[in-house]
């Protein structure tokens, strides 16, 4: 059984802004912000073919938000170079307006029915702080230099929803109440605090 959907169209618009400033000899500030508006622009139709006849279905998509990606973000980075060869950076990342992933075929409706035009569940906004430290070892051998580094990802151990599926048929809350709610969503949490320590050689 195959359903052929036609007329699915999305509009992706938005703005991005980035700025950098060397505050003094040791401190550099980097910032960036983005805001998007990603929506389905019209309803769609689908044709079901079972080998003997075709049946047409309608799908209520117009003005619904595209899911599975945050539509707003903010980045702030502060980098310090206290001594020659040393670099310490704090990077804060903030994400918002993240609608959960959803299937357009779930919005099927027939003539005379009241279609479901409610947006998919929007997961909570969240922010993550990363810390990065590196030091260029002041030693060179035959053109080979080295650097030691430490990266701490999600340094504050924030708990956040990284991805979600709207109205999950598999992992929604067993006492789910209402469509397009947190109880009806399947969520994937982001990773807790992690770090990596390494030595890099440059040839």
Please name every model-derived segment.
Residues 1-4, 50-58, 109-115, 168-182:
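Surface-exposed loop/turn segments flanking beta-strands in extracellular/periplasmic regions
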Residues 2-104:
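Gram-negative outer-membrane beta-barrel transporters
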Residues 4, 62-64, 118-120, 182-186:
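Short, P/G- and charge-enriched loop/turn segments at secondary-structure junctions
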Residues 13-17, 72-76, 127-133, 148, ...:
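Hydrophobic, lipid-facing positions within transmembrane beta-strands of outer-membrane proteins
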Residues 24, 28-30, 121-133, 152-154, ...:
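Conserved long hydrophobic alpha-helices within structured protein cores
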Residues 67-141, 164-166:
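C-terminal beta-barrel architecture of Gram-negative outer-membrane proteins
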Residues 95-106, 136-203:
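C-terminal beta-signal and adjacent terminal beta-strands/loops
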């Amino acid at each position: 059984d195959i359903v052929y959907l036609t007329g699915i169209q999305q509009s992706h618009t938005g703005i991005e802004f980035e700025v950098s400033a060397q505050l003094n000899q040791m401190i550099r500030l980097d910032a960036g912000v983005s805001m998007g508006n990603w929506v389905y622009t019209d309803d769609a139709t689908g044709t079901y073919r079972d080998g003997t006849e075709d049946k047409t279905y309608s799908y209520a998509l117009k003005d619904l938000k595209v899911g599975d990606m945050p539509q707003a973000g903010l980045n702030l980075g502060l980098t310090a170079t206290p001594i020659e060869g040393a670099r310490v950076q704090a990077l804060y990342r903030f994400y918002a307006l993240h609608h959960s992933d959803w299937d357009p075929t779930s919005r099927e409706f027939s003539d005379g029915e009241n279609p479901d035009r409610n947006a998919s569940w929007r997961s909570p906004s969240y922010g993550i702080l990363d810390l990065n430290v590196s030091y260029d070892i002041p030693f060179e051998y035959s053109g080979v230099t080295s650097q030691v580094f430490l990266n701490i990802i999600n340094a504050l151990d924030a708990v956040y929803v990284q991805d979600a599926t709207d109205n999950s048929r598999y992992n929604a809350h067993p006492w789910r109440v209402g469509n397009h709610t947190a109880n009806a969503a399947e969520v994937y949490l982001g990773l807790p605090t992690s770090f990596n320590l390494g030595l890099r050689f440059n040839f």
